[in-house]
Amino acid sequence: AAANNSCGEGVTWALADGTLTISGTGRMTNFTKDAPAPWAAQADQITTVEVEGTVTSVGATAFKDCTALTTVNIADGVEYIEAGAFNGCTALTELNIPLSVGYIKTGAFKGCTALTSVTIRDDCRLDMNVFPDTVEVNYAEG
């Protein structure tokens, strides 16, 4: 894979028709304010995020402020959702978190004000302020 579409050791990204697909093997990069995700400049064009199951983590602040994002599909196999991963995704209404996810870090879905409910594994570890107070969290047996 070309270096310009890398977003982790062995993890790549592709953006087409509003769908951002994360594929490959391993953990995504944890992005920061000073080193944002490579698609940050196009954040307002992303409507769907697909994370394939061979990717083990969703990187910190990876999809921060993707304000057009409505649908997130995380495939079974992903284990971690890092801090602030979807912070400020104000249009997000459909979120699929597989039972393989065992840890969701601080503020991962902070500011996702359109989200109403989510289902996670019953022993999933949650840090502080993962979801807005308005989100109904349901638990399923892992």
What residue ranges belong to the model's regions?
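Structural signature of tandem-repeat unit edges
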Residues: 17-26, 43-57, 67-80, 90-103, ...
